[in-house]
């Protein structure tokens, strides 16, 4: 056998020297094993492990974490369901206590209402007594002011008129008496002369007349003149005026009568008020006491069970969706990975030719072959730079950031974030159903408020009927007397006016002073009395009491207001300090909050893992930047060789699209290298003598920049002497796919 050569006892077995060397044809390799077996995996073997690719495994891990999260959420929701049902029972008990609260509060409220009514009636009694006394004295004072004012004015007018009349009569009498006597004397003198002459004439005439048997009487008017001299006005002419002056009324009788009439109804009303309200006590037992109520909304309403059943259905549906999506994604991921394996296989076969070529860094070749994708990305990024050293640094940074360890950290972080995203979607779907539970609980609260409103309204209606009966009783028995008193007072004032007018009529009736005195009385007294009567009429119309009635929401206003409050902690279904409006949704929010906190921790952990990868990549970037802008070293400092010692890279890429990258231009020390190699305890590949196309280093005007390229490790680890003296491994160059 080919592997029977002595000294080949180490594992794995290596092919004998020279069997893979070309047999006259460049690049032709003879298979080692007749059955075609190779120690590395062929294409079909690689494809058989496609389902174990990293993406499929990561997706399955994400699926496992999502299933665990769904199971955890389901368990937590079941626990929350039990707590919610327990909370519903406690809320129901609280609702029972609240709807029964009017039963316990009614007695106290009834006593408070009775005390309020009693206090109001006591105050009303005092107010009525004071008002009656005040109105009584005010009316009497007003009447006195009116009639005394009128009496003074009346006395002034009458006495003045009578005094003026009497004085005038006396003056007229004196003038008349003196004037009449003087006139009488003068008339007597004139008439005496006339009488003498007339009598003389008559006597002569009688002398002649006697002849005829007749006679003419003589004139004698002295007696009438004497009467005229003795004429004087009678002293009784001023007796009537004096009688009027002495008979001016003082209205004492009218005032006494009026005052007695006014005081009588007031005294009677006071007596009735004292008798009616003196010992009045409102009967608190007449107010109703509501019966106790019981609520059963937890038993009749299946909202909580339906909510958690719906939440469980959402979790199961989401779990099925995630299983389908992630499993399909994991299966679909096998397709590009299979295609990638095929490309990787062919790329690796193509790039394995680099091993047989000289002027390549073996470590770079191994990296390119083993990591084709990251190496291709590095080469693509490095192609943007013309400087070979910078190209190498760019490729190094990408290789540093995409090393197996770094990629493991990166993929672990991405898988964690993807798992968190799936959990967040699942949790958000559950969280969106919480308003449904809040609506159900809101219905509970509204039911409690409705029962409270009905109980409160019924109690208020019954209590208001009792209060209205008290209003009617007081209005009939107390203010009815007030109405009677005001009517009697109006009648009294009318009597006062009529009596006064009667006195005036008796005194001045038929005289010139009667009409003026009536006008003065109407002006001074009548108009004022009319105003007082209008006021008394207004009092009579408005003299009634209306105690304030109890509102229908006496016992339900606070609970109803808590439902409309913007502060959720004010809800009557919440404990003091709760952030939610009720205990039931508080249980669900606690579960969701705990899951959110756990999810946040996972996000932080995944982010920290991603940050580790970022920090690692930054280390590589910083290191590359320090070298990126560094100064080039000369030959003595380990810099590149002179341009004329470089191998000719050729005019372009080969048939596979690769460009030879020169490793070094050091002179060959083949003998020393072989001597050192043979001194090692393990066998090593022998250099195959070949007359390949790359025989010697030829200077060309197409030369690489003067930079150090391709060293990985010791500077003189590899030596190339211008011929293809690197033995290529035949394990990567078989023409057919192997298992």
UniProtKB/Swiss-Prot annotation:
Q: Which residues are glycosylated?
A: 177, 220, 245, 256, 274, 279, 283, 454, 483, 490, 498, 505, 552, 564
Q: Could you tell me which residues belong to the region Disordered?
A: 636-693
An example GO CC term for this entry is: mating projection tip
Known function = Involved in cell fusion during mating by stabilizing the plasma membrane fusion event.
Protein name per its UniProtKB record: Plasma membrane fusion protein prm1
Keyword annotations: Cell membrane, Conjugation, Glycoprotein, Membrane, Transmembrane, Transmembrane helix
Q: What is its main location?
A: membrane
Could you list the residue ranges that cross the membrane? Answer: 50-70, 150-169, 321-341, 396-418, 599-619
Q: Show which residues sit on the Cytoplasmic side of the membrane.
A: 71-149, 342-395, 620-739
Question: Residue ranges, Extracellular compartment?
Answer: 1-49, 170-320, 419-598
Species source reads Aspergillus niger (strain ATCC MYA-4892 / CBS 513.88 / FGSC A1513)
User: What family does this belong to?
Assistant: Belongs to the PRM1 family.
Query: What phylogenetic lineage does the species belong to?
Result: Eukaryota, Fungi, Dikarya, Ascomycota, Pezizomycotina
Recorded name of the encoding gene: prm1
Q: How does it sit in the membrane?
A: Multi-pass membrane protein
Subcellular location as annotated:
Cell membrane
Q: Does the keyword Transmembrane apply?
A: yes
Q: Which domain of life is it from?
A: Eukaryota
Q: Which GO terms describe its biological process?
A: plasma membrane fusion involved in cytogamy
């Amino acid at each position: 056998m080919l592997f029977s050569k002595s000294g080949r006892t180490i594992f794995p077995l290596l092919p004998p020297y020279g069997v893979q060397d070309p047999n006259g044809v460049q690049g032709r390799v003879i298979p080692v094993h007749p059955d075609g077996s190779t120690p590395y995996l062929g294409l079909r073997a690689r494809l058989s492990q496609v389902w174990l690719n990293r993406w499929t495994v990561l997706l399955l891990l994400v699926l496992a974490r999502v299933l665990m999260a769904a199971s955890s959420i389901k368990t937590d929701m079941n626990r929350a369901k039990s707590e919610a049902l327990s909370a519903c029972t406690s809320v129901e008990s609280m609702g029972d206590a609240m709807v029964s609260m009017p039963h316990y509060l009614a007695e106290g409220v009834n006593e408070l209402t009775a005390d309020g009514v009693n206090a109001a009636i006591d105050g009303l009694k005092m107010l009525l007594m004071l008002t009656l006394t005040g109105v009584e004295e005010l009316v009497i004072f007003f009447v006195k002011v009116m009639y005394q004012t009128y009496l003074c004015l009346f006395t002034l007018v009458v006495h003045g008129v009578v005094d003026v009349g009497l004085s005038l009569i006396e003056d007229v009498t004196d003038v008349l008496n003196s004037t009449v006597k003087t006139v009488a004397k003068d008339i007597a003198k004139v008439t005496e002369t006339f009488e003498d002459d007339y009598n003389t004439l008559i006597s002569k005439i009688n002398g002649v007349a006697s002849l005829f048997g007749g006679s003419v009487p003589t004139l004698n008017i002295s007696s009438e003149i004497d009467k005229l001299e003795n004429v004087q006005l009678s002293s009784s002419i001023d007796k009537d005026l004096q009688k009027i002056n002495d008979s001016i009324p003082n209205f004492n009788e009218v005032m006494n009568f009026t005052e007695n009439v006014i005081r009588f109804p007031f005294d009677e009303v006071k007596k009735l008020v004292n008798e009616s309200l003196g010992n009045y006590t409102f009967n608190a037992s007449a107010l109703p006491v509501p019966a106790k109520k019981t609520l059963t909304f937890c038993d009749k309403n299946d909202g909580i069970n339906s909510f958690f059943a719906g939440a469980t259905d959402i979790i199961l549906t989401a779990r099925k969706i995630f299983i389908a999506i992630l499993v399909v994604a994991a299966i679909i991921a096998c397709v590009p990975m299979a295609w990638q394996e095929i490309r990787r296989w062919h790329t690796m076969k193509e790039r394995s030719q680099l091993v047989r070529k000289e002027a390549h860094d073996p470590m770079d070749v191994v990296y390119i072959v083993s990591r084709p994708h990251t190496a291709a990305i590095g080469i693509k990024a490095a192609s943007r730079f013309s400087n070979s050293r910078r190209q190498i640094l760019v490729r190094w940074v990408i290789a540093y950031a995409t090393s197996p360890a770094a990629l493991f950290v990166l993929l672990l972080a991405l898988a964690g974030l993807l798992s968190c995203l799936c959990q967040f979607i699942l949790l958000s779907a559950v969280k969106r159903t919480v308003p449904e539970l809040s609506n159900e609980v809101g219905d509970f609260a509204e039911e409690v408020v409705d029962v409270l409103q009905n109980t409160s309204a019924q109690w208020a209606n019954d209590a208001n009927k009792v209060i209205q009966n008290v209003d009617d009783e007081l209005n009939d028995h107390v203010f009815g007397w007030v109405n009677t008193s005001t009517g009697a007072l109006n009648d009294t004032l009318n009597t006062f006016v009529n009596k006064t007018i009667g006195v005036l009529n008796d005194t001045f009736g038929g005289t010139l002073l009667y009409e003026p005195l009536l006008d003065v009385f109407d002006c001074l007294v009548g108009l004022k009395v009319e105003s007082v009567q209008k006021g008394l009429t207004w009092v009579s119309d408005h003299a009634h009491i209306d105690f304030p009635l109890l509102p229908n929401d006496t016992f339900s206003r606070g609970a109803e207001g808590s439902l409309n409050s913007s502060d959720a902690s004010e809800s009557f279904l919440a404990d003091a300090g709760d952030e939610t409006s009720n205990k039931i949704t508080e249980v669900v929010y606690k579960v969701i909050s705990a899951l959110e906190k756990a999810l946040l921790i996972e996000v932080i952990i995944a982010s920290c893992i991603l940050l580790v990868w970022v920090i690692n990549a930054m280390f590589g970037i910083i290191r590359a930047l320090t070298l990126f802008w560094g100064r080039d070293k000369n030959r003595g400092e380990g810099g590149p060789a002179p341009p004329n010692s470089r191998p000719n890279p050729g005019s372009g890429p080969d048939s596979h699209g690769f460009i030879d990258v020169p490793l070094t231009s050091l002179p060959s020390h083949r003998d020393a290298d072989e001597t050192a190699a043979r001194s090692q305890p393990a066998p090593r590949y022998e250099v195959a003598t070949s007359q390949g196309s790359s025989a010697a280093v030829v200077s060309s005007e197409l030369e690489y920049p003067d930079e150090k390229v391709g060293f990985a490790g010791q500077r003189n680890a590899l030596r190339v002497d211008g011929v293809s003296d690197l033995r290529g491994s035949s394990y990567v160059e078989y023409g057919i796919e192997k298992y």
